[in-house]
């Protein structure tokens, strides 16, 4: 197959179609074959897999995925890329391209229509401005996929896998780790993209858990607690939770924190996901 991942080939395609990179869509195309191979390796793509690729660009990564997977559904928001993808992926009968915004799709319905009962994985080179909304859509909607392998800004990847007591630990860390096991696969320098982004990138794989990391009575309460606790990082738990969106009374908080064996003077950034689970469940009994 005619690979398009070299700088020369990519520039030829961009010039042929007079393609204009969109800053608002955060478009950067990969031009390093080793990185592309490493992404597909890291995603553990095998013959029986069905892959949803978000943001195929001109199809460089798509080609590599298609050579290993059973079938690929590429979701591209930019309609000006569709004719380019028809050319670059024309030799791959196992690839279907749809011009859609993944954030507006009913992903359960899509998978039921395209890949019923199949092993589905997601691979994406995401624009940095929509990284978190897209990832959380797959996680919160409990879309039936095995894993998400995503290229994102290094700082966001660091936050996703951070643990208690570290500067990167926050609400995003807990949200991602509630639904999945995150694993950083490789660092990607700006030099392997056209045009070069101003930030370093990281490829991270989120292996979706069969059941959430902790068992909670009310997920909404669990995540509201986490949000309030990290909303005022420098405050003690007692003060952060009593002045957050939940507007909890200090007397109730003292009772629930004591029952959870958590010191009221600790900060939210020191609690494990398990401790947040215990706290949320004890609070649920009182509300």
Curated annotation (Swiss-Prot):
It comes from the Bacteria. Disulfide bonds: none annotated. Keywords: Cytoplasm, Methyltransferase, RNA-binding, rRNA processing, S-adenosyl-L-methionine, Transferase. It is found in: Cytoplasm. One of its GO terms (cellular component) is cytosol. The keyword rRNA processing applies. InterPro entries: KsgA/Erm, rRNA_Ade_diMease-like_C, rRNA_Ade_Mease_Trfase_CS, rRNA_Ade_methylase_Trfase_N, rRNA_adenine_dimethylase, SAM-dependent_MTases_sf. Belongs to the class I-like SAM-binding methyltransferase superfamily. rRNA adenine N(6)-methyltransferase family. RsmA subfamily. This is Ribosomal RNA small subunit methyltransferase A. The lineage of its organism: Bacteria, Bacillati, Bacillota, Clostridia, Peptostreptococcales.
